[in-house]
Amino acid sequence: MDFGSLETVVANSAFIAARGSFDGSSSQPSRDKKYLAKLKLPPLSKCESLRDSLSLEFESVCLEQPIGKKLFQQFLQSAEKHLPALELWKDIEDYDTADNDLQPQKAQTILAQYLDPQAKLFCSFLDEGIVAKFKEGPVEIQDGLFQPLLQATLAHLGQAPFQEYLGSLYFLRFLQWKWLEAQPMGEDWFLDFRVLGKGGFGEVSACQMKATGKLYACKKLNKKRLKKRKGYQGAMVEKKILMKVHSRFIVSLAYAFETKADLCLVMTIMNGGDIRYHIYNVNEENPGFPEPRALFYTAQIICGLEHLHQRRIVYRDLKPENVLLDNDGNVRISDLGLAVELLDGQSKTKGYAGTPGFMAPELLQGEEYDFSVDYFALGVTLYEMIAARGPFRARGEKVENKELKHRIISEPVKYPDKFSQASKDFCEALLEKDPEKRLGFRDETCDKLRAHPLFKDLNWRQLEAGMLMPPFIPDSKTVYAKDIQDVGAFSTVKGVAFDKTDTEFFQEFATGNCPIPWQEEMIETGIFGELNVWRSDGQMPDDMKGISGGSSSSSKSGMCLVS
C-alpha cells in the first residue's frame, strides 16, 4: 500500500468513526466538553434588549423558526384556553402526513373533537361559515382538506395569543436562544476531517461542529483565488441564495465565517455521494437505476426546484453530479453557484450558464429564459438516471459543443426499451424544445408535474414530509468520495494582496450562524432539550436570573426539562 492509499484509509476511518458517533450507530455523539460548555443561555440582562431589534412577525417567530415554533407551542400548552387551537393545529399537521388508509378516521376525529360545540376542545374562534362547510354532508377525503381550518387557526393564534406569548417567560426564553444564536462560532468551533472534493475556488471537506457533534461539509473559498479570478460577486450571490432557501430537498447553509486564508460555507453534508457516481460506478456491468428509484429521486428534485422557483431563483446547473444522497438515501440539489435570482417585476433572465448537454434550447440560442430551463435539465437528468447515458450523446462519445447544440435544438430524442410509456411521456414533456409548451412550474407550483401518471402511486404529502422509505440506503461504512490523492491539490496563488475593500467584503460575507439550520441543529442534537429547563411552579428559571445550575439548591426539586 502506497502512502497516498494509506492516507485515504486513515482519513476514511476517522471520518466513518465520527459519522457513526452522530448518526446513532454508537451510543453518544462526540462532543467537545469545552465548546459544549459555551452553549449556555444568557441571563435576561444580556438578551432582553433583542426585543427591540428583532423582527417580531408571527409567521417568522412562531412558524418558520424551529425553536420559536417549539416555544410558542409550549406556551400554548401551558394555558388551557389555548389548548383547542394547539391540538387542532397539531392534528391537522398529523392528518396531512398520514397514510391514505388512516386519513378517514383522523378526519372524523378532527370533526368530532374541534367542530362539535359540545366537545371539550371545541374551537369557538372558528368562523361559523367555515365550520358549516364541514357539516353540510359527508366529508370527501382529499389533500388539503383542512387547510381552511389550519389557516383560520393560525390567523387566530397570530392575534391575541401571540401578543400574550410576547409577554410570557416562553418568549424570554426565545430571546435567550436568539442571543446564543448570534454569538460568533468560527473556525475554532469545527474539527476538519478528510477532503471530499474540489470546488472552483478551493476544497470541500467534511467537518464536525465540536459542541454538538453534528457533521457538515465545509466549502472553502480561497481568498486570493477569489480575488484573482474576480469571483467575489458569484460567491456572494451563492451565499445569499443559500441563506434564502430552507428545504429538505436543497443543501442548507448553517454557518458562514472567514479564516486567514479562506471564506468558509458550512453546509449539509451528504454522505451518500452524488447521483452520477451511483449511476455509473456502483454497478458498472448494469449502470443506471430501475425506474422506481429514478422516479423517487426525480420527485424529490421537483420539490427542490419548486422551492427555488417560488423564491424566484433559476438554478441553471441541474445535473446528476449536483444531486447528492444523504445517510438515509434521500436526495438534495446542491451547488447554487450558477443560480440567479429574478428581481421584482422581472420574468426572465439572460446569459450563458450551465453544463453542456443540460442547457435548454432557448438558453443555447441566446434568448431570454425563465424557470423552464431547469425542467429541461430535469428531463436530461431523469433520462440519464434510467438510460445511463445522456439523451443527446452516447456515454463516452466525444461531441463538439457546436454539434451538441445542434442536437439539443433540432434533433428528436430516442428512448431505449428501459423506459416505460409513462416515463417516456414525462421525459418528452420535459425535453420539449419550445419552453412555452414544456412541462414545468406554473401558477407558483409544480402541481402539473405531480399530477403526471408517472407519479400516480406516489404519496407526495409523505414524500415532502420526509416520511417515505428511499429505494436505496447508502452503506454507512463507505465513503462515497474519491481517494484523497485523486482529488488533487490547488496551486499556490501568488502576487495577490488585499486592501480595505477586500477586507470589507470578507467581513460582509462572514455573517456567522444561519438561524433556521442552527436552531434545527440545537433541536436535533438534543442541546435544546438539555437547556430548556423550567421550574414546575411556573416561576422564572434560574438561568434567566443569571444563577448557575449548581448554585441554587432551593429550586432543584422544582425543575423540569421540556424539549
From Swiss-Prot:
- Region (Interaction with RCVRN) residue spans: 1-15
Q: Which residues carry this modification: Phosphoserine?
A: S5, S21, S491
Where are the compositionally biased (Low complexity) regions? 550-563
Give the EC number(s) under which this enzyme is classified. 2.7.11.14
After translation, the protein is modified as follows:
Autophosphorylated, Ser-21 is a minor site of autophosphorylation compared to Ser-491 and Thr-492. Phosphorylation at Ser-21 is regulated by light and activated by cAMP.
Q: Describe, from its UniProt entry, the tissues in which this protein is expressed.
A: Retinal-specific. Expressed in rods and cones cells.
Give the Phosphothreonine positions (modified residues).
Answer: T8, T492
Gene Ontology process terms (BP): G protein-coupled opsin signaling pathway; protein autophosphorylation; regulation of G protein-coupled receptor signaling pathway; regulation of opsin-mediated signaling pathway; regulation of signal transduction; visual perception
The name on file for this protein is: Rhodopsin kinase GRK1
